[in-house]
Amino acid sequence: MSSTSEVLVRDESGSTIVEFAILAPAIIGLLFGVFQVGLGMQAQNAMRSIAQETSRYAVVEYMRGNEVTDATIETWAEDAATSAPYLLNSTFDARVVSVTTPRVSGTFEKTLTLTYTPPAVVPLVDWVSPQLTYSRPIFVLDE
């Protein structure tokens, strides 16, 4: 009987699967964490690009003589965010606020603020992604 237990103690068959079972949850958790960080970085870069495109849209419209409203700029930014290439989900929001005293004389200054919550990809955990915010000024000529 002691020889059987000695054989079982020295037997290493199946050790690989046991080690994998111990390490797999940690490795899979790290993988989902990398995906979550990547989604956050993509969302932040998308927000910066959307802000740049929205600013350009507002400036070009003012140059054409079309005085677009703050609501029109917000709608344009939200439409750009939900379409290709960004394809952000419905948690995206754009707000435009006119600045009462512009920093550059002879201009209208507006502040564009974008907020977005990236989707959570971590399964089996009640994880909520942090809300991302990006702001930038828009200067248009006062003619």
Language-model features: locations:
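Alpha-helical assembly-interface signal, strongest on the long, hydrophobic N-terminal helix that forms
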Residues: 2-78
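Short, conserved structural patches
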Residues: 53-143
